[in-house]
């Protein structure tokens, strides 16, 4: 069984003909977030994907097998919620509430897309958005939550947190020097957004 253990950096330009000839590996979002997964190429060949922890594959990414061959990633259609609104403010409010719940969201021109969830669908409709369940590839924003299923402790969180603290410090006169190093959950008594001390 071949192993796919390298991803070509997105800024590296490969010849289009080379990429077009590469076999494809079609994966849903959840599988594209895993650094180790047994998968089957669209040609029927079984392969093992072994990538650095925290890697999130996107549609069009190119992997290199242990024999030097290329494989192109395709985002599989999956069940998602397509969220639209009659005005930008309503869509922005929906995005805010989803972000507050650390929900992975794909942001497009006039729409939001997220994994199907009946509770979130109900919340979004109550906010005044139109919510349709559909089959489509899902590519949420990268950033502070990496693939979106983890909160706080992946490759990009430290960078994003440090930047946020720097901006906060510039506006409030001080900053915390490092990100927290513990897991936490948000519940009814959550003090999300507060640092446990008063700002004078």
UniProtKB/Swiss-Prot annotation:
Residues 171-200 are annotated as: Disordered. GO terms for molecular function: nickel cation binding; unfolded protein binding. InterPro entries: UreE, UreE_C_dom, UreE_N, UreE_N_sf. Coiled coil: none annotated. Belongs to the UreE family. It comes from Burkholderia vietnamiensis (strain G4 / LMG 22486) (Burkholderia cepacia (strain R1808)). This is Urease accessory protein UreE. GO terms for biological process: protein folding; protein-containing complex assembly; urea metabolic process. Gene3D superfamilies: Urease metallochaperone UreE, N-terminal domain, UreE, C-terminal domain.
């Amino acid at each position: 069984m071949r192993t796919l253990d390298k991803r070509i950096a997105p800024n590296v330009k490969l010849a289009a003909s080379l990429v077009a000839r590469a076999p494809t590996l079609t994966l849903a979002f959840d599988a594209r977030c895993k650094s180790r997964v047994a998968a089957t190429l669209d040609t029927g060949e079984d392969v093992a994907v072994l990538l650095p922890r925290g890697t999130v594959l996107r549609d069009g990414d190119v992997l290199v097998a242990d024999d030097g061959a290329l494989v192109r990633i395709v985002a599989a259609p999956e069940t998602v919620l397509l969220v639209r609104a009659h005005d930008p403010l309503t869509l922005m409010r929906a995005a805010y509430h989803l972000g507050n719940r650390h929900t992975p969201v794909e942001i497009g021109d006039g729409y939001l897309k997220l994994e199907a969830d009946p509770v979130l669908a109900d919340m979004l409709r109550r906010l005044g958005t139109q919510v349709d369940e559909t089959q489509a590839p899902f590519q949420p924003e990268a950033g502070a939550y990496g693939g979106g299923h983890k909160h706080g402790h992946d490759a990009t969180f430290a960078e994003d947190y440090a930047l946020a603290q720097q901006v906060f410090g510039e506006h409030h006169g001080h900053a915390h020097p490092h990100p927290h190093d513990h897991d936490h959950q948000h519940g009814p008594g959550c003090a999300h957004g507060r640092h446990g001390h008063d700002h004078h």
